[in-house]
Amino acid sequence: CYQAEEEVLKFHLQEAMQRVNMDAQPNGFATIIMDELNPDKIKKLKTACHEIAVKGDFIKYKNIYSGVLTECSSQSAGIQLADFAAGIMNGYLRGALLSRGKYEFATDLFNEFILPNLRHHPDGRIMGYGVREVPSDTTIRNKLSALFER
């Protein structure tokens, strides 16, 4: 099943925007800032972000800026922190799903810094709140649930 890159980017961005908007409610405000390394992809993401924010979906984006701002990652502590978190998550998932036992350091960092800060339901569930599979896939969700719902 092939989908155009723009649609895939829009789908992932929409997932992120929904989470950010929910966390910013009722009185907060959020802005999405991305690394400016890939101008073509940034242009597609900016277009997708604007379409989602203006045309909307089932969520009204009142608490999120209707565009994407870009910044050089070497000058942005926020982007560097996001890269650090993504790297830890990548290492944790690789170790848990692909090569058990070879990613102890990433697992330790995940348990100390990422897991306690993941968005979760009031009952403690992380899947569907702080971790979502995109697009929805029951097989992948079951594998991830085993890792995040301890």
Functional labels for PLM-detected ranges:
Residues 1-150:
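A two-mode feature
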